[in-house]
Amino acid sequence: MKFQENLKNELDKFLSIQENRFPKEDILKIDLHCHDYNSDVPDELIGRILRVPETWLSSERLLQELEKNGCDALTITNHNNARSCYILQDKGVDVLTAAEFSCWVPDFEIGIHVLTYGFTPDQEVQLNKLRKNVYLFLQYTRIHNIPTVWAHPLYHYSVKKMPPKDFFDKMMLIFERFETLNGQRDTWQNMLVKEWIDQVDEEQVAKYSKEFGIDPSIYCVDPYKKSLTGGSDSHMGIFAGMTGSYLYVPDLKSRMQTVSKSELVLEALRNGNIAPFGAHQNTEKLTIAFLNYVCQIALNYKDPGLIRMLLHKGDMSDKVVSFMASNMFSEVQKHKVTMSFIRLFYNCMMGEKPSFFKKLLLPSHYKPIFEEAVKIAEIGKGTTDKDVVDGYYNSILTINNQLNDLLANRLDKKITNLHLDDKIGEKSLDSIIESLELPISIRSYIDKSNNNSSIDISKFLDGLSFPFFASVFILAAHFTSAKTMFHTRPFLRRFSEQLKKFEQPKRILWLTDTFGDKNGVSMFLHEMHEQIKIKGLSIDILTCSNEVVPDDNLIVLKPIGEFTTPIYKDQKINIPNFVELHNLFLKGEYDRIICSTEGIMGMCGLYLKHAYTVEANFYMHTDWLMFARKALGITGHNLDRVRRMLRFFYRSFDRVLVLNSDQKKWLTGSDMNLEDQKVFQTAHWSNSCFTVQPSDKSSLFGVETNTPILLYVGRISKEKGVLELAPIYKRVKEVHKDVRIVIVGKGPALQQLQQDIPDGIFIDWVHQSKLPAIYSSADVLLLPSKFDTFCNVVLESLSCGLPVIAYNKKGPKDIIVDNECGYLVNSISEMTEKTIEYLSSDLNETFRSAATKRAKDYDADTIIKELLQSVGAGDEQQ
């Protein structure tokens, strides 16, 4: 059974028991945790920097939502104040006074939230003074018979530091009531709270009392009776009342004739007559709520001021994010179509349908998007909570897909125009990278005459603003909902391990931009895919392509856009639907990532890492710094910029997996500054088809059996050093007149190499099943590349008993045992000399035997086992 399915089944059993605990005629339905506009100081630092409240929702609208969702008793729990309750009470509304106080646990230096009910204005003043020490706070509430609830007990901790077990033991001792169902938390977190409380009995409470030297009656009326509550924790109004509590009041009907509902609620809370209600929680509901909030910010946002932002407490990353968000909202507010959509979308979410006249004023290409938004107004009238949530979310997905299509089509036209204009193509890559740098001087942004960009940015962005901003808002809502629910994932994992219940299985999503291409990364991933299927590993490989065919453990997303750049036209850039990827990660129940490419999927990996708070590992296949220098001609300061960008990228991952000792030394050295414990060396293995085959030079190469054959296999490009083959071959031929060279592969330098070696035997790219015969029929493999991080060709060659002569660099240096199964050289002249020396010697059989022996050291089972252990998934995968 899948993890989420198991959680849902356990939750359904729990809800069924709670629903039938009390006689239905004697219960009041209430949402014990909801907010309105008076929750005006956000807990999150970025919200305080931007000076935005947690919501602009009015009390009246909140009450409408609560009543619509069947609540027959009312309360509002704003942060550290009950202003809304007092205002409503003055208007004659029967509302239970309440607040959610942010309290400090001084001995553990941890902040928690405490829902507090039935206090007076004077008591509120005292509670705000005491909340700096939760023990004094709870002593006060005990003395004055003010019921409290520890809100979302497993939320609000630093992901870097797990609160100790003693903290939870002590909180169990001093609290009577615990919020078990919170509408803003996922089912995993809620069920862990329930399981934790279930595992504590009277004997445990007595044990904690003795351990801490605390008399729990100082804090609790009945220390041995632990009650469970529920609340929506709604800030936007949407879904308020869908999670909450049934409160049991014996003889309710007659009691209501003389006692207000708020007093009866207070009585039931004090007596612990509470049964939580709700539903399976995942990110959909919270995504809708955050999208509602983003719309509210866009409609109400005001510039918080740059100086204020710079002087505000918080680290630089918080201020950079705040600065970017502030500029985003400011730009959105200047765009009429986007603001019209946001206003329409928000009003429809709140149940207000626009007039027919307004719909007629829309451009035709926007009408389908706006029409889908209008449907949301009707969805809110759904018959069940699930219908409402599913209806809202499906409309959001439809709108997102429409926006993506519109954005991709327009972006494709823009890029096509850039190709035709060729303003980028005619410039060197050096100058393009230099133009990406942002000047420090403010004057340079004001004085347009200093802007020497070759591209008219405003013209390029024209027509992209609405689909881009709207898509970003939808993606931001998904990101924020996942971040809110899962930012304590490391803690929840360890907490579940302590409870020995609801432990999430380890499951890897492996991301790559390349799978169907003819390159080393693709070849390795094909091998990995086969091993995943053979071994039944909990790993799925994901790529984005129109050509790759899906398979078991191979997920293929169709791109919403497919582009090539004027800079590097050989490689397609496929853009996935980020929301589709976001939901796929959740549905697949993955808990960690491996990424094999630095392109779009590299960015996707970092997005998922931060959205779901999972470990992300980067598998470094390519030396991009050398590629930038050798293949792209980048030099000097711009090469340094590339290095810094790579450093920033690699340091963003939890671990980097490298394929040779040189890479590890470089990454942990002064140039890159990665921590040594974050860099792990791994390796490739060769396909089982690579074994020694009978030599057949005649049919394969069209030469005599005794003709010495030099072999090169791989991409034919300058960065691979292939142009060195011509002078090497020429010099060897002077000594060994009958020697021939066979070159297998294709690439941009093929034509030049054919001109340089007119008598060379050139074979196009062949399927790997045909390569063993070619390797077995050659005499020595020449590898003039200084670029390869591992070089599968070396391992394939050795597996077929073919010695290799390569540069003493990177991957080959770690694989080849010098003077046993080949030679490691330092120059073109030394490679030439060793080739002549080997062909002149009688070492053929000795070297061939050593080659096959060395290849056996690279065993797939061992390599995969060590790889999984290095990414923290070894125990469950094997």
Where are the predicted features?
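Aromatic "clamp/platform" in nucleotide-sugar-dependent glycosyltransferases that forms part
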Residues: 786
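Conserved acidic donor-binding segment of nucleotide-sugar-dependent glycosyltransferases
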Residues: 818-829, 837-842
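Domain-core and long-helix interface of multi-subunit machines
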Residues: 3-21, 27-53, 121-246
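Nucleotide-activated donor-binding/catalytic signature segment of Leloir-type glycosyltransferases, i.e.
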Residues: 750-769
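Conserved donor-binding/catalytic core segment of Leloir-type glycosyltransferases
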Residues: 510, 702-720, 726-730
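Donor nucleotide-sugar binding/catalytic pocket of nucleotide-sugar-dependent glycosyltransferases
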Residues: 385, 643-693
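Short hydrophobic beta-strand element within catalytic cores of glycosyltransferases
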Residues: 803-806
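Short alpha-helical donor nucleotide-sugar binding micro-motif in glycosyltransferases
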Residues: 766, 773-778
